[in-house]
Amino acid sequence: MKKQAKPFRLDIKPTKSDTKPSAETDIFPVVGIGASAGWLNTFTQLLHAQPMNTDMAFIVVQHLDPKHIRLLPELMARETVMPVIEARDGLNIKRNHIYVMPPSTHSLTLLHGVLHLIQRPEGRGKYLPIDHFLKSLAQDRQNNAIGVILSGTASDGALGLQAIKATGGITFAQSENPCEFSDIPNNAIAAGDVDFILTPKEIAEKLAFIAHYPHLKFPLFNVESKATTQEDEELKKIFQLLREHIGIDFTGYKKNTILRRIKRRMAMHQLNRMTDYIKFLQTHPKEQDMLFHDMLINVTSFFREPETIEALKKEIFPQIIQQKSNVGTIRIWIPACSTGEEAYSVAIALFEFLGTQVNTMHIQIFASDVNKQAIDKARQAIYSQSIEEAVNPGRLQQFFVKKKSGYQICQAIRDVCDFAIHNALQDPPFP
């Protein structure tokens, strides 16, 4: 099994050819496209509708047999005037170029605008090249990252889109009609991190607009910038709308982060001025909900911090049990639980620690979040197949039930977890 890494962090050492781009000059949007079965036909449709001067780079990651003949660049070059290049290690990406992952590659990553390849070991671990690349794309390009999931039969890609959306990028999935193989896009959609569900032609049209939108010229997260006086006033109006509609005050949040989320929403609605977006918010209450969800940035996964889980089992749980009698109550509160993955991870870890002793204990795990949509999903306890990357086969078999749409947490774990809407900054704690 591949060792679980911390979310969105890739241990890649820069080569001598790597040069970190300056604040804005060398940054341009990069579109990561993931697919498997039936993808070439749909990608061709996207190419035919795609302008040649978007100033974007396109990087294609697909599931192919390592023995597959390397003809993809030649086949794709017939459909576009953009240069189509097979990705190679240490290659600097350029605007208006298409890069294709070679079939023998296990993983393709992007660091400081440079491609890195790791050869695919035969028959080892789950093969998730789309997730791996999209996570690196999110880390490298942040709000300049765009993720597209096309036709395919697998569960790869959902976690990669989550990473892109969390860093302020924009995400697409191909609509089921006329998608020949819909497993990959449907799994991504079910995970809840897709901004647009469109046909290949519609995706190309939307990309053409987004390419020149000011949102993508916003500096990266590690570049400091301050909101202007006008932006400060406009932010106050938006905060007031959200406070009246939802009851949450975002005044104390980092302005740069908030501005990125707002400008992301503006790009999606093709609005160039903040004043126009404020008017749009005033006349579209549903958009206030969408902006609220965007601001919360629900980044989570099962067992996302393996070291923390091990510390609970080795240090914290033994202390709790030591303080209890043979028959006692264990109560745990997990605030900001998002869609429930971390709360269920703690519950599973506790069950593993207790073993047969679990039957003698009364366990109550309270999990809370301000996001009603996230709490609703946590209560359903159904997750896409992409969790196979984070949950080992033994845990999947013992604590999950296989469903057509993915996996559901088993009844025993669900019975000890209570989810509630709660603002940890304003509401009193659980007694």
Where are these regions (language model features)?
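Conserved acid/base catalytic micro-environments in cytosolic active-site loops
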Residues: 1-293, 307
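Phosphate-binding P-loop
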Residues: 22-26, 322-329
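Residue-level recognition of the N-termini of beta-strands and the immediately preceding loop/turn
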Residues: 29, 56-57, 145-146, 328-332, ...
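Class I SAM-dependent methyltransferase Rossmann-like catalytic core
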Residues: 251, 269, 276, 281, ...
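Class I SAM-dependent methyltransferase core
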Residues: 304, 334-336
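Extended basic-aromatic, gly/pro-enriched interface segments that bind polyanionic ligands
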Residues: 335, 356-431
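Conserved SAM-binding loop of SAM-dependent methyltransferases across substrates and taxa
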Residues: 339-357
